[in-house]
């Protein structure tokens, strides 16, 4: 995926969106006890305003992939995906499994059922982005 967005998104809007998503990704890591040191910029990708993928080096020298955007902020160890495109597939599958588990355990909990539907919707979106060859050329 190249660092592009749809034509109607201005460069300034795209830049602001990417900065906001980077901050959101860092906040998510910090809330999970992971402290950011640097970014592996050549492996990061974003498609404003849909999804941003960041490869982060932590203060203790570990690497993580982080996803943000119009999706749940989430992260995983860098070993789980070789690149940003594979990472979209990883999170799409992970969120589908999480949604299935939520549906199975939250029979009468409308909030959990709605969140499961949200995860399913976002995972389908990630699959579509991953499959668009023109984004990855």
What residue spans do the PLM features occupy?
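Charged, low-complexity surface segments at secondary-structure and domain boundaries
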Residues: 1-13, 103-114
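Amphipathic protein-protein interaction modules
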Residues: 77-118
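Short aromatic-glycine-(Arg/Gly/Cys) micro-motifs in beta-strand/loop hairpins
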Residues: 42-76
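A cross-kingdom feature marking charged/low-complexity
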Residues: 42-56, 108-137
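Negatively charged, low-complexity tracts enriched in Asp/Glu with abundant Ser/Thr
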Residues: 2-46, 134-137
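Contiguous interface-forming segments/domains that mediate binding rather than catalysis
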Residues: 4-7, 23-26, 58, 77-81, ...
């Amino acid at each position: 995926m190249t660092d592009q967005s749809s034509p109607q998104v201005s460069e300034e809007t795209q830049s602001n969106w990417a900065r906001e998503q980077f901050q959101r990704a860092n906040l998510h890591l910090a809330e999970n006890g992971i402290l950011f040191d640097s970014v592996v910029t050549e492996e990061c990708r974003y498609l404003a305003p849909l999804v941003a993928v960041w490869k982060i080096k932590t203060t203790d020298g570990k690497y993580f992939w982080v996803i943000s955007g119009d999706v749940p902020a989430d992260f995983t160890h860098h070993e789980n995906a070789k690149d940003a495109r594979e990472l979209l597939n990883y999170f799409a599958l992970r969120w589908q499994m999480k949604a299935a588990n939520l549906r199975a355990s939250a029979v009468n909990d409308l909030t959990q059922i709605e969140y499961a539907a949200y995860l399913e919707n976002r995972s389908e979106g990630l699959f579509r982005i991953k499959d668009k060859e023109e984004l990855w050329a």
